[in-house]
Every structure is written in structure tokens, then in C-alpha cells.
Amino acid sequence: MALLSIVSLQVPKSCGLKSLISSSNVQKALCISTAVPTLRMRRRQKALVINMKLTTVSHRDDNGGGVLQRRIADHHPNLWEDDFIQSLSSPYGGSSYSERAVTVVEEVKEMFNSIPNNRELFGSQNDLLTRLWMVDSIERLGIDRHFQNEIRVALDYVYSYWKEKEGIGCGRDSTFPDLNSTALALRTLRLHGYNVSSDVLEYFKDQKGHFACPAILTEGQITRSVLNLYRASLVAFPGEKVMEEAEIFSASYLKEVLQKIPVSSFSREIEYVLEYGWHTNLPRLEARNYIDVYGQDSYESSNEMPYVNTQKLLKLAKLEFNIFHSLQQKELQYISRWWKDSCSSHLTFTRHRHVEYYTMASCISMEPKHSAFRLGFVKTCHLLTVLDDMYDTFGTLDELQLFTTAFKRWDLSETKCLPEYMKAVYMDLYQCLNELAQEAEKTQGRDTLNYIRNAYESHFDSFMHEAKWISSGYLPTFEEYLKNGKVSSGSRTATLQPILTLDVPLPNYILQEIDYPSRFNDLASSLLRLRGDTRCYKADRARGEEASAISCYMKDHPGSTEEDALNHINVMISDAIRELNWELLRPDSKSPISSKKHAFDITRAFHHLYKYRDGYTVASSETKNLVMKTVLEPVAL
């Protein structure tokens, strides 16, 4: 950074320092800082203690024959009674609120138009950062669906000033590039499909390879720059070493900052970003948290953003949050009735998590018109959970083979050979797949039922492999386990039919980039299997399911420990995340990002629930709080 007085950025030893961390010491510093929790990181609630050991129950078979020994896991029951769900009400579905929102949307569009452009002499010192900050704020507040055209125009403007080796400054006439503006631009432009290289971050290192910034910046401005550097680093592609360095460095720096600065809206924003990052972040949860802190940071509220009315953006965000909250309650009431009336609702061997699945769906898809996607996702995931518990624990090997064969024949008359509990599961599955295929035909213009059935057949075959492993006590190799586990994870079946109900056309050439055997599908399935195993392997083992990525790795590597296996798998997960970023955002893709975004967000939703434990099986702590915060509770207007 020639011709500019700079300071190397090192982890602050006290509040007064303006520097961060050297590349040579960053690994050591990170190990130190991550060993001790930061002072105000939100405490994890104590896990609900559940007896996950196998319970064996005796059942007489339906033909009056001998007594069958069945395996049942001790899952906690549904936490949300239908009577409670049906009692929910919200005033925010009224026309007065939607009319107010329409008015504010137009006012925000005018705000976009008021930002100076290159045809005006004034405003040239901050026009780039203002546009980026507007786009970033709107997206984090969950109101970006109203401003897609304005966002594209703003980012085209920013990109026109992007320099591959230097990035950008705050404005088009800025003398020097700026780390905050460049990091925010790198992240935002990349997420919108622009071809930007992370090599630009090398410009912001000194001669010793340390990240650096101008000495004239305040501590708050430096911290904001590092926060956006961290956010940018999370959308890394494979092989981007500078992004890895930026992530390690910025995470360490921000954790140290949190131990020094007082509690504020800015500190809470940092905490949220560090906790959820990008791959476990849910858009609606982010909007809920950002509403609480938005516009209170003195740096962002200063005169450096004279064309931005933060209170107007906040007003719209609150209105939109509550209007959608009203729709959520109606959809949730429908789902609760559907579950209560379903054939499988009375089954006691399985987890009933329809409310939790709805929460996931509505946290990643907030457009009112995507109701079919949300409802289809819930129904699909509920049935996949029932099937998972049936194949893993309750069903006998002979029964499971009968069910698999009956499904492949796709004929209701085949249910006569099934035990009663399987008839209930088969009926629900048959009705749901036909119903969702009809929904998909409305948007895709073609019958997708056979396509979906093929995906389920592969899924059930993988279930059968695992059931046979459990029955025989066989422990496969890691490669054999993962090949089958990608399919049995359910990532493909949980994703495929819901995304076909969206209003986004998915012709075959796009499906080939999302569905099996695409690299996108392979990565998403691997991530769900590996992350799920790291959170569930002990409980699964207690239920008699010995095969997991951890146990299979240890078998392949005699003398290795569980810690060795977990370290290896976590590296695989990190690498796969960067690859999945590339598959979503690659500039040379034939299909638009929008066509793959919901599939990508489903992966993020699963990762969120597996962040600390199996948040589906044990849904009484973090998951329950998520339901309350994003579905049941409105924000104060």
C-alpha cells in the first residue's frame, strides 16, 4: 500500500491498539483464543438429557404369529400441540400493514435513486461504499425481494470501478483503495455472480505479509473493516489461500475485540456473525437479529452515509417481518392439521418434528409466493424422518424388504402384504408424492413423479444397505460407508421435490447441475452425512447403529482415536464447503444462482440444526428458541 501511512493489523492487547495479527503467528493466536470462550458469546443451553440407549419392545406380528423384538429409540415427543398451534393469531395480516409496507418500499427505492452517480460532481468520495452498504443492509434485514432491480443497478455501478489488483475505495474518486469497501464488495459481488478474485486482498498486506490498514482510521472503523473481511472470507473458493488466511486472522481478531469492548449493538452483531457465519446462517434468523442492532452503530449512523435513512429501512424490515409472521402462522396451522390427520401421526417409534421443519423452511424462503415450497419441504422431511426411524430401528429386515419392494411397484394393492404400521407410512408417502408432483407440474409444466420416485428408490436401497449392516454387525470401510451414506442422508430427496414447486423453471440442463449425479448434489449430500455423523454418532451407537463416518475411519486407520477421525472429517467438511460455494457461485455456470439458491439454502438449514448437536432429535433447546424467535414471536413495531 504505497504512499499511505499504514499500521500492521495484529490481535489487540488492549482497547487502545490499532493493529491485528501477523500471518506467521495467526495459527498460534487462533489456538489460544479459541481455547477460551469469549466473554459475551451467548451461552449454549444445557443439552436435554435423553436416554438414547436402545429399548427393545415385544410386538406380536399382524398375522397372529410369534412375538417380534423391535428396537425403539427414546425420542422426546412433539413439543407443539395442535390445540396450541390452532390458537395462534396475528393482526399483521390486515391490509393496513401491507399498504404501509408498499408505501415504505417506494420510499426506499427513492433512497436508492438519491445516491450520487458518476454524472454528478458531488458525492464521489462515498458513492461506492454507500451502494454496497445499502445492498448489504437490505439483504441482512430480509427485505431484498422488493429491490432486485435496484440491487443489480447498484452492483453494476460498483463493479464498473472494481480493480482486480486493488479493489475499490469508498468512492469513485477515492485516492486509495479501502479494506472495508473492498471486503464488502468482494463478498457482495461474488454472492451475486460477478467475477471477482480474492487476490485483491493481497493488496492489503504490508511487506511482511501482515494485513494492514491506514493509521488514520478509528478503532471502530478498523473493527468494521475486519468484520467485513471475515464475512468475505467465508465465501471462499477452493485453493484461495488468502481467504483462508483472512478467515483465521479476522476470526481471532474479532474474538479478542469482543473481550475488550463494552456490550453494544455492534458487539452483538459481531457475536452473531462469528456464531453463524455463512454456512449455518438462516436469512430469517439473521433478519430477526439484525433488526435488533441495525442503525445503532455510531460509525454507520454518522454523516458518512447522508443518503441513507436507516430508520426507514428498519421500519420496512419490521413491517415485512410481522406480515410474513402472520402468513407463517396460517401455514403452520395447516401443517399441524395435516400432521394430525396423517396416517403416521400416531406412530410412537418416530420423531414428530413438523413444526421444526416448517421453521427451517420459512427461515430460508421468506417470499409469500413460495408457500408450496415451504409446505412441501415440511411434508417431505416429516415422512423422511418416519422412514429413517423405521429403517434404522423399528422395522425388521424382512418387513423392510417388503416395504422397499412395494414402493418400487407403486401400487396401493401392494400394501396388503405390509404390517399395519407400514401401511400407514406407505399411504402417507403415496399421497404426499402424488400431491407434490401435481404442485410441481403447475410450475415446471411437466410430470416429475417418475423422476422423484427414482430418487426415493435409490434412497430406500441405501436404507436397506444400512439395515443389513445393523442386522449383521458389519462395519464397512470409510469409502463404502460414505458412498452409501451420501444417499441415505436424504439430502437429495429432501431437496428435489420441494424445489420443483418453486416458480423458478428447472429444465433438465439446470437439474443436471443440482441433482444427482452432479457435483453440487454430491457435495451437499456429503456435507449432510459428515456433519450429521459428527453430531449423532454416539447416540446412534447407543441405539445399535455402529457404522458412522467416525467408526469407519477408525477401522481403516488402526490406532487412530475418535479425535483423529473428527479432525479428518472436519477438514473434509471445510473443503467441501468451499467447493459447494464454487458450485453455487461459479461465474461460468450455465444456470443462474437463483435456480440453485434454494437447494443451497436447504443445505445451510441442515447445517444450522447440526451446529452444536442433532437439533432435530433433541429439539427442546436451541431449536425451540429458533421456533419462538422466527415463527411464533413478532417484533415490536
From Swiss-Prot:
Domain remarks: The C-terminal part of the protein seems to be involved in the cyclization step(s) required for the synthesis of pinene.
Chief location of this protein within or outside the cell: plastid
SUPFAM superfamilies xref list: Terpenoid cyclases/Protein prenyltransferases (SSF48239), Terpenoid synthases (SSF48576)
Pathway info: Terpene metabolism; oleoresin biosynthesis
Organism: Abies grandis (Grand fir)
Keywords: Chloroplast, Lyase, Magnesium, Manganese, Metal-binding, Multifunctional enzyme, Plastid, Transit peptide
A Pfam cross-reference name: Terpene_synth
Cofactor binding remark: Binds 3 Mg(2+) or Mn(2+) ions per subunit.
UniProt-annotated location(s): Plastid, Chloroplast
Presence of the UniProt keyword GTP-binding in the record: no
CDD domains documented for this protein: Terpene_cyclase_plant_C1
UniProt keyword Transit peptide present: yes
Cross-referenced InterPro entries: Isoprenoid_synthase_dom_sf, Terpene_cyclase-like_1_C, Terpene_cyclase_plant_C1, Terpene_synth_N, Terpene_synth_N_sf, Terpene_synthase-like, Terpene_synthase_metal-bd, Terpenoid_cyclase/PrenylTrfase
Reaction equations catalysed: (2E)-geranyl diphosphate = (4S)-limonene + diphosphate; (2E)-geranyl diphosphate = (1S,5S)-alpha-pinene + diphosphate
Function: Involved in defensive oleoresin formation in conifers in response to insect attack or other injury. Involved in monoterpene (C10) olefins biosynthesis.
Name of the protein: Limonene/alpha-pinene synthase, chloroplastic
